[in-house]
Amino acid sequence: MTDRNLRELLAPWVPNAPGRVLREMTLDSRTAAAGDLFVAVAGHQTDGRRYIPQAIAQGVAAVVAQAEGEAEEGEIRELHGVPVIYLHRLQERLSALAGRFYQQPLHALRLTGVTGTNGKTTTTHLLAQWAQLLGETSAVMGTVGNGVLGHIHPADNTTGSPIEVQQLLLQLQRQGATFAAMEVSSHGLVQHRVSILHFAAAVFTNLSRDHLDYHGDMAQYEAAKWRLFGELDVGQRIINADDATGRRWLQKLPQAIAVAVSGTLPPERQGDWLCAGEVRYHARGADIPFRSSWGEGIVHCQLIGEFNVSNLLLALTTLLALGYPLPALLDSASRLQSICGRMEVFHAEDRPTVLVDYAHTPDALEKALTAARLHCHGKLWCVFGCGGDRDKGKRPLMGAIAEQYADRVIITDDNPRGEAAQDIINDIKSGLLDAGRAQVISGRAEAVTSAIMQAAPADLVLVAGKGHEDYQIIGKQRLDYSDRTTVARLLGVMA
């Protein structure tokens, strides 16, 4: 297909489609313009077929709409002179349709997909960084944003629509990308957003309770994740053997690659494997010895926490499975950077190590403090607050967690919004066994400054809650503020 012609586009499904030249393809009637192809899908929240008249009024050249059943398959109608072609199970076919429209841009780059409840963002960024250190031009697609490294733009969804995915792949191809790491969400898998893609490798991080409002139960949630490994076009399959779901999947996929931080692999494995030895944690990161089907060695990294050891070893194994050489991977590992605002490490000579993290729930704060403790050789400090006009029940819980896991606690503001900052602080303090143990410094910049100035060089300071955010909401004002920038300025380093 050398141009975007409706007849050629629909040839696999509708042999008698009219020959209209198409400019662009869209699911959103609000952005439809003259010459576009409007795709009207019956979605989970709205039925795109309701907006066909609006799209036609805006000048679209043609419409492909979801048929009510097989009887309508291939039916062609006209509305105000615009052809409307009906396809059965359109949502399932949309990935293939978009792939034909954008001329299969994936053929020009190597794509890896990462799925799981936690760790998708970090693992995709590690894959992209590492591949780039070995000479690739790398891109990421996911929660933090999409684009070539160094030029990442914010994203609305973890996995975009099939059209957005193909548009992005074409854009990355034009920018010279040779390697891309994509977060693949359970929603994206159920909604067939990536069904036409070829993944050189697929990675499973872990599975825990999440998104049950959408999937209904854990069995359906697991089934959604399984689609990437059991139904789609995948080369290498890399699976976390420390996870209960991962161990079950390894039994179903004998040639899949098993990765274990625990040091214990499932018995009688047929496929390749990688297994960590005893990890040494220190203030600047971790040293991770390992054995594998490709050889053994020690990974020296700047990442914090046991969960990041797992993410890193999954990335390492994936790149080994794709043929990247072990010596080059080990030589470059120390240059891997933590993800912006995700257990991000800041350090300077003779100053405390500082972590900036997005943890803003009780569970996330507990995990962040537990991870930080592994790397702390002095006192562990925690600077945090809770958002205003949000879940008040978590405030005392987070206070109790900070008191339990940190040696020094400073309670501060975190987007107080329309609530009085002192009321939020009082709610947090109500969870403390000894309220006198916590300092209260309402201004967030002052609180971060105080912690860093008081802490000794062997101490570690966790600044939790905002992560990559660059604002503070007070009342109705959205003020410029960044924990990362504040910490970097105090330590005299780059953010």
Swiss-Prot record:
* Name of one Pfam family that matches: Mur_ligase_M
**Record protein name field:** UDP-N-acetylmuramoyl-L-alanyl-D-glutamate--2,6-diaminopimelate ligase
Pathway field of the UniProt record reads: Cell wall biogenesis; peptidoglycan biosynthesis
On this chain, the residues bearing N6-carboxylysine are K225
- Residues annotated as binding meso-2,6-diaminopimelate are R390, D414, N415, P416, R417, G465, E469
Share the record's PTM remark: Carboxylation is probably crucial for Mg(2+) binding and, consequently, for the gamma-phosphate positioning of ATP.
- Indicate which residues the UniProt annotation says bind ATP: G116, T117, N118, G119, K120, T121, T122
Primary subcellular site in the record, as a coarse category: cytoplasm
- According to its UniProt record, the EC number is 6.3.2.13
